[in-house]
UniProtKB/Swiss-Prot annotation:
<dbReference type="Pfam" id="PF00215">
    <property type="entry name" value="OMPdecase"/>
</dbReference>
<protein>
    <recommendedName>
        <fullName>3-hexulose-6-phosphate synthase</fullName>
        <ecNumber>4.1.2.43</ecNumber>
    </recommendedName>
</protein>
<dbReference type="InterPro" id="IPR011060">
    <property type="entry name" value="RibuloseP-bd_barrel"/>
</dbReference>
<keyword id="KW-0554">One-carbon metabolism</keyword>
<dbReference type="GO" id="GO:0004590">
    <property type="term" value="F:orotidine-5'-phosphate decarboxylase activity"/>
</dbReference>
<dbReference type="InterPro" id="IPR017553">
    <property type="entry name" value="3-hexulose-6-phosphate_synth"/>
</dbReference>
<comment type="pathway">
    <text>One-carbon metabolism; formaldehyde assimilation via RuMP pathway; D-fructose 6-phosphate from D-ribulose 5-phosphate and formaldehyde: step 1/2.</text>
</comment>
<dbReference type="GO" id="GO:0019647">
    <property type="term" value="P:formaldehyde assimilation via ribulose monophosphate cycle"/>
</dbReference>
<dbReference type="GO" id="GO:0033982">
    <property type="term" value="F:3-dehydro-L-gulonate-6-phosphate decarboxylase activity"/>
</dbReference>
<comment type="similarity">
    <text>Belongs to the HPS/KGPDC family. HPS subfamily.</text>
</comment>
<comment type="function">
    <text>Catalyzes the condensation of ribulose 5-phosphate with formaldehyde to form 3-hexulose 6-phosphate.</text>
</comment>
<dbReference type="InterPro" id="IPR041710">
    <property type="entry name" value="HPS/KGPDC"/>
</dbReference>
<dbReference type="InterPro" id="IPR001754">
    <property type="entry name" value="OMPdeCOase_dom"/>
</dbReference>
<dbReference type="InterPro" id="IPR013785">
    <property type="entry name" value="Aldolase_TIM"/>
</dbReference>
<dbReference type="GO" id="GO:0043801">
    <property type="term" value="F:hexulose-6-phosphate synthase activity"/>
</dbReference>
<comment type="subunit">
    <text>Homodimer.</text>
</comment>
<keyword id="KW-0456">Lyase</keyword>
């Protein structure tokens, strides 16, 4: 069984809240995407936290420096998970992990553009990372890349960490990523691009369970 996560990627504050209202009953985790949080700020997190107390909320900060300093306000405001880039300095990554631990929350290390994903996963596991994010970005997807080979690499390490997979996941690939060991399955366009986002979210969650 895997958890499902919906990526909220719109820059429009009200549209983001409206979409969250449709999909929140059908997913486990609401993700505030990087452009979305940069554009709308911590107020959006506070709004979603108040409206959706039963969902986990991930804020995709993609922290690259000043780990503890950047992440702490978001944990304090109600984030359950924030992200830090795997290409960041280990001290930065440790700072985000420390901030998460201070609030009883989780830090996700995003492996986007990490060269040796197995080696970095082992390093951050030693630091106490909670979740590894296997992430094929939008620009990489446009070039035809997928996260599936990298997912197999990371889950094959058997480090006991949660593993999130993002990048072009749709109903037809949910079984594949679940069988490959993903514990969190992230869908964005497959939900928000659907004619009925609530139904699309429910379908993906049904396949993930």
């Amino acid at each position: 069984m895997a958890l499902t996560q919906m990526a909220l990627d719109s820059l429009d504050f009200d549209a983001t809240v409206a979409l969250a209202e449709k999909v929140a009953p059908h997913v486990d985790i609401l993700e505030i995407g990087t452009p979305c949080i940069k554009h709308n700020g911590i107020k959006l997190l506070e709004t979603l936290r108040a409206k959706f107390p039963n969902n986990k909320i991930l804020v995709d900060l993609k922290t690259m420096d000043a780990g503890f300093y950047e992440a702490e306000p978001f944990y304090k405001a109600g984030a359950d998970i924030t992200t830090v880039l795997g290409v960041a300095d280990l001290g930065t990554i440790k700072g985000v992990i420390d901030a998460a631990n201070k609030y009883g929350k989780k830090a996700q290390i995003d492996l986007i553009n990490v060269g040796d994903k197995a080696a970095r996963t082992k390093e951050v596991a030693k630091l106490g990372a909670h979740i590894i994010g296997v992430h094929t970005g939008l620009d990489q997807q446009a070039a035809g890349q997928t996260p599936f080979a990298d997912l197999a690499t990371v889950t094959g390490l058997n480090l006991g960490l949660e593993v999130s997979v993002a990048g072009g996941v749709k109903p037809a690939t949910v079984a594949q990523v679940k069988d490959a060991g993903a514990t969190i399955i992230v869908a964005g366009a497959a939900i928000y691009g659907a004619a009925d986002p609530a139904a699309a979210a429910a379908e993906i969650t049904g396949l993930a369970k």
